[in-house]
């Protein structure tokens, strides 16, 4: 099974991402519902600019984060660790992402928060359902996939 396909399939079934941002030695993490775009390998989220994590991000920043389920046994652990870049979307790019986000989360129509993109550059997917400690790695720039 192709690594990115397996990762994308799993991410499409989840809905909460945690990401962390750093500014001048200070770290902060946040959680949000996300829409995953498998073609761009990116999450789309809504978050207000006044939040601590948005203030630390500025218009764009490096991030790292996770998406994980809540299994009751170690054998069922599945999750993603990633690094990438967050940026606030503007104009048509923002409008298109918001429409797609609103289709997945209709309640978001009530929110005026800006749309942000978290572009993933490296993904490590742990899937213990394929065997304890099974890891798959995807890297954007090298096209490398490791199983």
Curated annotation (Swiss-Prot):
Superkingdom of the source species = Bacteria
Identify the InterPro entries for this entry: Split_barrel_FMN-bd, UPF0306
The family assignment reads: Belongs to the UPF0306 family.
Q: What is this protein called?
A: UPF0306 protein YhbP
Organism from which the protein derives: Escherichia coli O17:K52:H18 (strain UMN026 / ExPEC)
């Amino acid at each position: 099974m192709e690594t990115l396909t397996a990762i994308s399939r799993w991410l499409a079934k989840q809905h909460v991402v945690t990401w962390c941002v750093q500014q001048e030695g200070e770290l902060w993490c946040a959680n949000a519902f996300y829409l995953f775009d498998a073609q761009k390998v990116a999450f789309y989220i809504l978050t207000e600019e006044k939040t601590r994590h948005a203030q630390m991000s500025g218009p764009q920043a490096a991030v790292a984060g996770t998406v994980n389920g809540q299994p009751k046994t170690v054998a069922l652990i599945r999750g993603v660790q990633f690094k990438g870049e967050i940026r606030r979307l503007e104009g048509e790019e923002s409008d298109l992402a918001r429409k797609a986000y609103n289709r997945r989360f209709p309640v978001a129509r009530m929110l005026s928060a800006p749309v942000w993109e978290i572009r993933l550059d490296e993904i490590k997917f742990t899937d213990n359902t394929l065997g304890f400690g099974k890891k798959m790695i995807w890297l954007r720039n090298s096209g490398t996939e490791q199983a």
